[in-house]
């Protein structure tokens, strides 16, 4: 293959990737006011400026686009957790909540999608989100096992603790999305979030796990 042909192929592939991302971004914008089940293919392609048939070069269906959005949104959630682990503070819980607030503000549309579609009308997307959350729980359980005193915990107990933390985090995300940018409401959400996570942490400290 000549250099020109190779460059042309690369350019076409780059254009295809850009169009695919444009479709995801457009769907996310349109979903700010509705659910995936009510969003039409024509709405998304009109937003991007391509003909409806061109959609199928990138996704087999709107359900497949929704699964891709779920995976993209979960990458945002994972990046937030990595950020929290990478930036230890004197008060780990306050620091984690601060990072959560910051990330929800920066990536509000991703978190809105996860919260709304977790129990939404598209089965493939519900399953994709549930699968991603289970994987997240497994990763967090592995992290918890590295803490002093938790290495000998029963794996089921580690997973239970991880799932509690993930559930707590999602409830905080929902509260942040509901309260919006209002300072007083935000302060109340942060206070409740910190107390909620401290309660989980205290329970973990006093839990007597018996290895099986």
Describe each model-derived feature in a short phrase.
Residues 123-149, 159-175, 187, 191-202:
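Amphipathic alpha-helical packing segments from all-alpha helical-bundle domains
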Residues 106-124, 141, 174-178:
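Amphipathic alpha-helical segments used for helix-helix packing
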Residues 31, 59, 63-73, 80, ...:
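Alpha-helical DNA-contacting segments of helix-turn-helix folds
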Residues 8, 33, 69-96, 111-112, ...:
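Amphipathic alpha-helical linker/stalk segments
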Residues 15-27, 44, 69-77:
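Generic hydrophobic, amphipathic alpha-helix propensity
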